[in-house]
Amino acid sequence: MRHLHLLSAAALLVVAACSKGGEKPAAEPPAPPPPPPPMAFLTIIYHTPKDAKAFEKYYWATHIPLVQAKAAEIGFTAVELTKFDATLDGKAPTFYRQAVLWFPDMTALEKGLATPGFKAAGDDLANFATGGLTAMVGEQTNDASPLLSGDTTAFVTVLYNNPKDGAAFESYYAATHLPIVGQGAAEIGFTRAELAKFARNLDGSAAAFYRQAKLYFPNAAALKTGTGTAAFKAVGDDLPKFADGGLTALVGHLTSAP
């Protein structure tokens, strides 16, 4: 009880002080700081190589160690390596792998791309990416959240082609499509959503794709269950209403070792 009395007395003193005539009212609290800039990324989508076994051997034994050795110089803060397993409808995957380097913002990304370390990593691609690749930069358009790790983490991703009307796409995407995804989240069972928008190809030309959306699941079994739900069907049925440029839908998993 003593602590309560002391607290009450202190409160009365504050009120009395604030009530004295002639004194200016307390200043308004400072405005909250602006939100941090969106995270930026470089992504490489590998096309199917001529020899997948040779690709994997070089990728893990030489290329990934090279990128890791240059990490501090390039300045990326996280890396995500994934492998596509199939298209969403069960056919052979349209692409083979995807690698993403994350940066704090676009300024840090542009600085990293200009380093000798990044040039060394880029020059190495021709040594194993025999099927070709698509390299793009962009920004995440939703809040970052923790990512499950480990080779069992599965995902479904949609790569949107450039739409006929970008403004109309964005309006419908934000106002209608994303709420449908959110409403079905519990039923679908994904653990994380990642939304990204491509700014350009790495060489400065127009981006090969417009946007990418990924839903992550704990494992392939959870993904299979989730993509079989009525809620996921509702998400899929909504795509033709705004993705008028076409899209590629794939399933895959994270990889951290050969």
Task: Please provide the spans of the model-predicted regions.
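Macromolecular interaction modules
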Residues: S19-P258
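C-terminal motif of bacterial Sec signal peptides marking the signal peptidase cleavage site
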Residues: V14-A17
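Bacterial N-terminal signal peptides that target proteins for export
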Residues: M1-L7
